[in-house]
Amino acid sequence: MRTTFDCIVVGGGHAGCEASMALARLGQKVLLITGNVDRIGHLSCNPAVGGIAKGHIVREIDALGGMMGLWADKAGIQFRTLNRSKGPAVRATRAQVDRDLYMQAVKQDIFSQPNLSVWQDTVEAIIVKDGHTGGVKTALGQLFNSQYVILTTGTFLSGLMHIGQKNFSGGRLGDVGTSKLSSSLHSIGLHLGRLKTGTTPRLLKTSIDFTSMEMQLGDTPIPSFSFHGPKPSQPQVPCYITWTNEYTHDVIRSGMDRSPMFTGVITGTGARYCPSIEDKVARFADRDRHQIFVEPEGLTSQECYINGISTSLPLDIQLALIATIPGLENAHMVRPGYAIEYDYVDPMQLHPTLETKVLPGLWLAGQINGTSGYEEAAGQGLWAALNVFCKITRQEPFILGRDNAYLAVLVDDLVTQGTKEPYRMFTSRAEYRLLLREANADIRLTPLGRKIGLVGDYQWNLFQKKISDIDTLVNRLQNIRIKPDTLDPSIFLELGESIPNRAYTLEELLKRPSITFQTLRKIYSDLPITSEDVYLETETIIKYAGYLDRQEELVQRSAKLEHSYLPKEIDYTKVAGLSSEVIEKLQIVRPQTLGQAGRISGVTPAAITCLEIYLKKIHAFR
């Protein structure tokens, strides 16, 4: 049995699967250690991938050559484009996925991937050799050697589950966790905190009355995540919408005295943007109802996921509250909802590569860094893997700017500001979100994935054709002029647009708010035939040209700070004009650039000016 590897990945969740696949595909010998091989790629909470900002991350993973988009497209049973009526910056893809099909897709790739070995075991300690990572020790007494370890432990670090006043240890309902690894990380010098998340009851599909609910269908044509993979081919199924009511809320209030959240049993901080139903009822007392989505767990599954009633209330209260909800009056509970507390590492102890500052060779990715969500985890797994690969091959680190990717915003927020609650990505977190559209993730990132070696020939050729098609289409639109006497006035009147009184290029016409490519085809039938993606991206480039230019200008203005690097061993006590509070925060984060320093909470513009003056002095001295 092989015991030495180029990299060891601990944890078979979304971060671990993405990390191990990337490194193995890049030619590295990888060992993936997970506590339960049957649960590799398991969707622990809701059976869905994507959503606002999260869909952006999935597409960025795909653009770089990662896997999540391919797996979601294979297993998707309902696809929707969210915010379709809003601007291109916030439009996002979300897929309801078949839980079993998703795991099958992941495991098929994991077990067939050359260079990738899988071992079922529990990692209990990080081996340290001469101040560097040396490998891991497992519960079965195995010692695996590697200079590079990526920890992707999810909720399994000292996990403690709660249902009412009952609690039991584990990483997930039905799976054991680990407390010894927490102790090992603490002994290394990492500071751990405590977070909390939760999940909803699962109900028997045949016991639900769907006729009293609102049906929600997916989109046609079906959107997808991957720029280069097969289009979704699974049968598409509906979700359903229902609501809580005052009776539901009365039942919930009656159980608050036995809620682990409201009696102080749970000490970990929960997700602000994914509150439990008891938290929603307490915080929004003026609301007489809350929306619930009834989501299928899969095409052949007999369970439904009840999205919107995550809870850790006692079992009798869970049963009673479900019986008050329209359509669920006679529903049979298959699995209860529960909360889980777990350890995480303060991410300000990480470099922007996600390598720990205290122990070279140890990387962290996913919920261990304080994030929530499959997509955020998968993105960190890929980010960590690419940086491990760069370190092994002695290349420059793989670090992107906040104007390049949501992945960069995510990592920069974590390592610069840290988090005291589960971090979730939103489009509002990105200051350059119009540049970071879901639709142009390939344009932003595929050349980088190709350069590092993760984007294959097929994906690269498709990308190059797309770029060529966009260039050709833009050129045609700029050079084709339409005279007013050749136009059908009714086309413009129907849209509420003024009738052109002079010759216009097709580009000028497309800039009008109500005119789309569908309209242009009526005006000029000889447009190049290409994919819908090319039409949409071209339309965005032309319609939003002014806004895009303005964001590019903002990027250029901040570029000076982003490229002003701070010395690694800088002593901030020697920088004149800095307050003790600012010095303390700079010493903790150790920012790499002035731009990153400026994003640290409490570091003022005046402090940045002091740092600029200091840099000028030391550069002049040299």
Swiss-Prot record:
PROSITE patterns noted in UniProt: GIDA_1
Cofactor dependence: FAD
Cellular compartment(s): Cytoplasm
Residues bound to NAD(+): 270-284
GO biological process: tRNA methylation; tRNA wobble uridine modification
Keyword Hydrolase part of the UniProt annotation: no
Assigned keywords, A-Z: Cytoplasm, FAD, Flavoprotein, NAD, tRNA processing
Pfam family membership, one: GIDA
GO terms, molecular function: flavin adenine dinucleotide binding
Binding positions (FAD): 11-16, 123, 178, 367
Matches recorded under InterPro entries: FAD/NAD-bd_sf, GIDA_C_N, MnmG, MnmG-rel, MnmG-rel_CS, MnmG_C, MnmG_C_subdom, MnmG_C_subdom_sf
GO CC annotations on file: cytosol
Similarity section: Belongs to the MnmG family.
Subunit structure: Homodimer. Heterotetramer of two MnmE and two MnmG subunits.
Known role: NAD-binding protein involved in the addition of a carboxymethylaminomethyl (cmnm) group at the wobble position (U34) of certain tRNAs, forming tRNA-cmnm(5)s(2)U34.
Protein name: tRNA uridine 5-carboxymethylaminomethyl modification enzyme MnmG
Organism: Lawsonia intracellularis (strain PHE/MN1-00)
Gene: mnmG
